[in-house]
């Protein structure tokens, strides 16, 4: 309203018109509007209107201006608006502008019927605005519901994506765990195979050691047998050695032979003198021959003994070689038997290892087949779960789409019902005013009793009746449908009657209030004109 920006300048401008304002303004007339603009509180209003010290009206106006001056620019604007509404001439004189709102001149210019017509027009405009806002609100509600449906769809997709991510993470973790377990099993298998190889090597070494000890034992047994044979030979030789009696007899024969030889030598020495005798010669000749024969026999015996010794040596050597060869043959036989037993044991071990290998391969193939079957079953179950999830999502989408279509149909139904109500209200508005004037005296007494109670509430919240009407209209529109027990025509008729009764009561209340305010304005205007003439 004001072009000033400084509060002091605004109120200093009004100071030049203070005498005029104090002489013209009635504080009881503008305080409700100022209180509605929230520049006056109930305490200030009580002070201005009911203070026993303020008996004169001019003093009340002065105190009111002082209170408004403390509120600053807001109080200045509210005060000018009150002047524009209730004192347009004074507003024109103070601001030099034409008032945009001529509320206080309606009764003077058009009378009570014009005020009623204006109020009814404003009520219809507000009702139409409320209906438009209701339609807009319903469309916004439908749009919000569609957005909620889309949001729920998006959340479903997000939940599905999150679930797929979690399943992927779980699968990757399970795959990693399986790889770790497989690696651990492979390491354990390698360790066990190494231990098995080491055990086999130790077993082979122990077997070789056992064979070597067995061979050493057999060689010791053979040596023992050879020594036993030598011992038996020595015992046999000792048994075949001549006895002591035979040796004594031979010693006696030897002594006899030596004595005879000595006798012969003595006889020879005695007979050297008679060597030339024929007998001696014959004896010598015989002796020589016997000596030669003896020498020949001795040489023959010596050669025979030599041959015998050589033969015995050869026989002993052959016997030793035979025994050695027998021992070697026995050792070779035992070695062959040992190697044969070892080869048979190795073959048995190889057969056992091949059997174990076949069993391990069969068990591995069986486990591989079981693992493959389990993986296939798991893949089938995952595929089935995925298909069921997709079907569930499709059914959820169909449910959401059905709900959205249902909501859209409900919105269209509400819009059609609202259009029908608007059409019916327009038809009722186009009806002649005579019916209203005829039906007006019937509710006059009842509305007169209610008007005094509702004046203050109407001033404080002018939009409350329209909100109540809107709520009633919405409740009626929501109550209509297949589940309502009343037919649509009866419900529409009841709605029209309630709406018409409410308009009549509202018009009567407004008319009475405007009539009372008109009387007060006439008194104030006459008083202000008198004061203006007096001041001029």
From Swiss-Prot:
Any one GO cellular component localisation term in the record: cytosol
Inactivation phenotype: Mice were born at the normal Mendelian ratio without obvious anatomical defects but display impaired innate immunity. In response to C.albicans infection, mice develop fungal infections, many of which target the central nervous system (CNS). All mice die within 5 days after infection by C.albicans whereas more than half of the control mice survive for more than 12 days. Impaired zymosan-induced cytokine production. No defects in adaptive immunity. Mice show impaired recruitment of neutrophils in CNS after infection by C.albicans, an immune cell critical for antifungal host defense.
Compartments where located: Cytoplasm
Protein modification: Phosphorylated at Thr-231 by PRKCD downstream of C-type lectin receptors activation: phosphorylation promotes interaction with BCL10, followed by activation of NF-kappa-B and MAP kinase p38 pathways. Phosphorylated at Thr-531 and Thr-531 by CK2 following interaction with VHL, leading to inhibit the ability to activate NF-kappa-B.
Pfam families in alphabetical order: CARD (PF00619)
Keywords from the UniProt entry: Adaptive immunity, Coiled coil, Cytoplasm, Immunity, Innate immunity, Isopeptide bond, Metal-binding, Phosphoprotein, Ubl conjugation, Zinc
Known tissue expression: Specifically expressed in myeloid cells. Not expressed in non-lymphoid organs.
Signal peptide from the UniProt entry: none
GO molecular function, one term: CARD domain binding
Modified residues (Phosphoserine): 2, 277, 424-425, 431, 451, 461, 483, 498
Basic and acidic residues: bias regions: 487-502
Binding site for Zn(2+): 3, 10, 73
Residues annotated with Phosphothreonine modification: 231, 531, 533
Example GO BP: positive regulation of granulocyte macrophage colony-stimulating factor production
Coiled-coil regions listed: 117-272, 303-415
Glycyl lysine isopeptide (Lys-Gly) (interchain with G-Cter in ubiquitin) cross-link, chain position(s): 125
Domain CARD: 6-98
Annotated spans, Linker: 99-116
Database matches in PANTHER family: CASPASE RECRUITMENT DOMAIN FAMILY (PTHR14559), CASPASE RECRUITMENT DOMAIN-CONTAINING PROTEIN 9 (PTHR14559:SF3)
The protein's assembly and partners: Monomer. Homodimer; homodimerization is mediated by the CARD domain which forms an extensive interaction with the adjacent linker and coiled-coil regions; leads to an autoinhibited state. Homomultimer; polymerizes following activation, forming a nucleating helical template that seeds BCL10-filament formation via a CARD-CARD interaction. Interacts (via CARD domain) with BCL10 (via CARD domain); interaction takes place following CARD9 activation and polymerization, leading to the formation of a filamentous CBM complex assembly.
Notes concerning its domains: The linker region, also named autoinhibitory interface, is required to prevent constitutive activation and maintain CARD9 in an autoinhibitory state. Disruption of this region triggers polymerization and activation, leading to formation of BCL10-nucleating filaments.
Protein known as: Caspase recruitment domain-containing protein 9
Native organism: Mus musculus (Mouse)
């Amino acid at each position: 309203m004001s072009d000033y920006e400084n509060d002091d300048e605004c109120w200093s401008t009004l100071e030049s018109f203070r005498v005029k304002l104090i002489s013209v303004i009635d504080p009881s007339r503008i305080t409700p509007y100022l209180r509605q603009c929230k520049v006056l509180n109930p305490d200030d209003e009580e002070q201005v209107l009911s203070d026993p010290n303020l008996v004169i009206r001019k003093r009340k106006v002065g105190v009111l201006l002082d209170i408004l001056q403390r509120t600053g620019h807001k109080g200045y604007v509210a005060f000018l608006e009150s002047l524009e509404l209730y004192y347009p001439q004074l507003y024109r004189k103070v601001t030099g502008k034409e008032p945009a709102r001529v509320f206080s001149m309606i009764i003077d210019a058009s009378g009570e019927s014009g005020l009623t017509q204006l109020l009814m027009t404003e009520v219809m405009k507000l009702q139409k605005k409320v209906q438009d806002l209701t339609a807009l609100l319903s469309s916004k509600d439908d749009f919000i519901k569609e957005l909620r449906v889309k949001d729920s769809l998006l959340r479903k997709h997000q939940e599905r994506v999150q679930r797929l991510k979690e399943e992927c993470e779980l699968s990757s973790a399970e795959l990693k765990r399986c790889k770790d377990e497989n690696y651990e099993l492979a390491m354990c298998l390698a360790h066990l195979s190494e231990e098995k190889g080491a055990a086999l090597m130790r077993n082979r070494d122990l077997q070789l050691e056992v064979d070597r000890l067995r061979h050493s034992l057999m060689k010791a047994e053979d040596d023992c047998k050879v020594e036993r044979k030598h011992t038996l030979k020595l015992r046999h030789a000792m048994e075949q050695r001549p006895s002591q009696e035979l040796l004594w007899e031979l010693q006696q024969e030897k002594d006899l032979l030596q004595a005879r030889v000595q006798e012969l030598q003595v006889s020879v020495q005695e007979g050297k003198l008679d060597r030339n005798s024929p007998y001696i010669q014959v004896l010598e000749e015989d002796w020589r021959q016997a000596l030669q024969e003896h020498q020949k026999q001795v040489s023959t015996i010596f050669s025979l003994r030599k041959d015998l010794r050589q033969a015995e040596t050869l026989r002993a050597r052959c016997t030793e070689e035979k025994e050695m060869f027998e021992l070697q043959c026995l050792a070779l036989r035992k070695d062959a038997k040992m190697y044969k037993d070892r080869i048979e044991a190795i073959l048995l071990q190889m057969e056992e290892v091949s059997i174990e290998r076949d069993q391990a391969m069969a068990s591995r193939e069986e486990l591989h087949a079981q693992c493959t079957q389990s993986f296939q079953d798991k893949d089938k179950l995952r595929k089935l779960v995925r298909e069921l999830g997709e079907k569930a999502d499709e059914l959820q989408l169909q449910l959401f789409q059905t709900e959205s279509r249902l909501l859209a149909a409900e919105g269209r139904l509400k819009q059609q019902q609202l259009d029908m109500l608007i059409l019916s209200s327009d038809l009722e508005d186009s009806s002649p005013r005579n019916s209203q004037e005829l039906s007006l005296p019937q509710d006059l007494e009842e509305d007169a009793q209610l008007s005094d109670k509702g004046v203050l509430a109407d001033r404080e919240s002018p939009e409350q009746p329209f909100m109540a009407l809107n709520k009633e209209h919405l409740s009626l529109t929501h109550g209509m449908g297949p589940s309502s027990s009343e037919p649509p025509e009866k419900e529409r008729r009841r709605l029209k009657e309630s709406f018409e009764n409410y308009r009549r009561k509202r018009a009567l209340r407004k008319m009475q209030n405007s009539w009372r305010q008109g009387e007060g304005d006439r008194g104030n205007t006459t008083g202000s004109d008198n004061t203006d003439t007096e001041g001029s």
